[in-house]
Amino acid sequence: MIHIETIVAPVTSPGKSAVSILRISGSQTKIVAKKVLGSIPKARFATYSKFLGKNSVVLDQGISLWFPAPFSFTGEDVLELQGHGSPLIMDLLIKRITSIENVRMAKPGEFSERAFLNGKIDLIQAEAIDDLINSETESSIRASLHSLQGDFSSHIKQLISTVIEFRTNIESSIDFSEEEIDIDLKSLIYIKLKELEEKFIKTKKVISEGSLLKEGKKIVIAGPPNAGKSSLLNALSHSNRAIVTKIPGTTRDLLYENISINGISCQLIDTAGLRDTKNEIERIGIFRAWEVIKKADHVLFVIDKTTKQSEQKKICNEFIQNISVNNIQITFILNKNDLVQDKFNTEKIESLLFINISARTGQGIDKLRKHIVKIAKNENKEGVFIARRRHINQINLAYNEFLMAKKKWIISKNIELLAESLRLINRFLGEITGRFTSNDLLKRIFSSFCIGK
């Protein structure tokens, strides 16, 4: 795609620094090179250059890099100027370059958008650039790089390829739809439905793992009232985020706090104490607590160490029974260990393993942090990539359409209905990589990028 306008923007952060970099991309870049450098540098070589203003006044000197189309990040002619890190020099250079006809400042994310529109990267890879820049943990950096290198795109493209092959097999027989459907075709359709379902399930699984890195592992702090749940949230997050009192039922709504534990991104969720109550407001809080518990990746179940051991076991067993079908990782925590002056270690009560802590004094908290990291690292898999909410929504749309198509086929054996569903599935999946997309979606995605990307 040829853009009439050429764009320019600083690649480096604003402010004083040792080096600042300007990037220029577009059809006028050769003219920019001739006017600012005096000539076009040798392609893909670092060239020492003087950066010229009007009337050949030297504004700065440094390194120029020339990437002729299509062998550049954007797929267009690209010039990069690496000069001294003075904001004033950068401003003078930008003013000089934008004075050239059809050259303007780039919008946020416009270089990446042009790379996408010119087929250099797909939409997943474009989003991965933004995710990589905004990564706050080592695991999310690795996952963003996997996406940038095309691992995520490969999963989606394999799924699309299966859908296209399926469509090809059945659409060729639509012209003969008034005839009895061939037994071999029926058999093929069932085989393809099974194959497609298996690939959907596999893709949904890896996307679910990828969303944990993007949004953080959801760790819900649950337990009876006054067990010290809010104190634990404060201790883990090094903050006074939650209100702590001796009055049972102080926490009545969900409280979220995003933290990083040794490079593991986590979202802590403090919940209302679980008990039977007639208080309507507290009951709503408890209902919300159960809702978020059932969607958790990990539950820290906190009970008061001063409670009788038989009662501790009863409370834990009741909780396990309530969420047994959800297959959620549970860590049992005995809080207020400082009040009984016991050792801060792990202990077994019958078959359950407990970690002893004092959220008030901070004792045992480091041991709990190490435990959370150990579980997270055991769950982490190489090759996981970042999955955005947009990706998850599109996969769910495609999978739900598939389930409907499968059901309709079993009931009606209508090839035309099946073909239409496969067409929709193909479109839903294509929107993930950008094969089918709208200008509004592109604007929303790329406007969140920083200028220069």
Swiss-Prot record:
Keywords: Cytoplasm, GTP-binding, Hydrolase, Magnesium, Metal-binding, Nucleotide-binding, Potassium, tRNA processing. GO terms for biological process: tRNA methylation; tRNA wobble uridine modification. Binds 1 potassium ion per subunit. One of its GO terms (cellular component) is cytosol. Its EC number is 3.6.-.-. It is an enzyme of class 3 (hydrolase). Mg(2+) binds at residues 230, 251. Its main location: cytoplasm. GTP binds at residues 226-231, 245-251, 270-273, 358-360. InterPro entries: G_TrmE (IPR031168), GTP-bd (IPR006073), GTP-bd_TrmE_N (IPR018948), GTPase_MnmE (IPR004520), MnmE_dom2 (IPR027368), MnmE_helical (IPR025867), P-loop_NTPase (IPR027417), Small_GTP-bd (IPR005225). SUPFAM superfamilies: P-loop containing nucleoside triphosphate hydrolases. (6S)-5-formyl-5,6,7,8-tetrahydrofolate binds at residues 23, 80, 120, 453. It is found in: Cytoplasm. The keyword Amino-acid biosynthesis does not apply. The keyword Signal does not apply. Its cofactor is K(+). One of its GO terms (molecular function) is GTPase activity. Exhibits a very high intrinsic GTPase hydrolysis rate. Involved in the addition of a carboxymethylaminomethyl (cmnm) group at the wobble position (U34) of certain tRNAs, forming tRNA-cmnm(5)s(2)U34. NCBIfam families: mnmE_trmE_thdF, PRK05291.1-3, small_GTP. PANTHER family: TRNA MODIFICATION GTPASE GTPBP3 (PTHR42714), TRNA MODIFICATION GTPASE GTPBP3, MITOCHONDRIAL (PTHR42714:SF2). Homodimer. Heterotetramer of two MnmE and two MnmG subunits. Belongs to the TRAFAC class TrmE-Era-EngA-EngB-Septin-like GTPase superfamily. TrmE GTPase family. This is tRNA modification GTPase MnmE. It comes from Buchnera aphidicola subsp. Myzus persicae (Myzus persicae primary endosymbiont). The lineage of its organism: Bacteria, Pseudomonadati, Pseudomonadota, Gammaproteobacteria, Enterobacterales.
